[in-house]
Amino acid sequence: MSKGQLEHTNITVSDPERSAALFKRLCGWHERWRGPSQMGGWTVHVGDGQAYLALYTDGSGPLHHAKGAPLNHVGLVVDDLDGAERVVI
């Protein structure tokens, strides 16, 4: 079986700046990147040298999510892509 590690998690937030400030204070992380997102809107990445949170907003204003809905995706890095593919397919 392949070995993997969490690389990033992308979540939708109402205010990436405020969320980034919170996680930097709470976890001692730093800002890794910021800019326009691929889907429109804005993203700020905060984390350490190993993993990060991508804090995304589409700019549409206040967001109200059902439980679990703000999670967009989780990025994993694996040492054996073919082996990991066999596990999930």
Residues of each region from the PLM?
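Short beta-turn/strand-loop junction motif enriched in small, turn-promoting residues
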Residues: 29, 60-61
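Short, conserved beta-strand segments within well-ordered enzyme catalytic domains
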Residues: 54-56, 75
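N-terminal low-hydrophobic presequence detector
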Residues: 57-58, 89
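Core segments of cupin and vicinal oxygen chelate
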Residues: 3, 11-53, 83-84
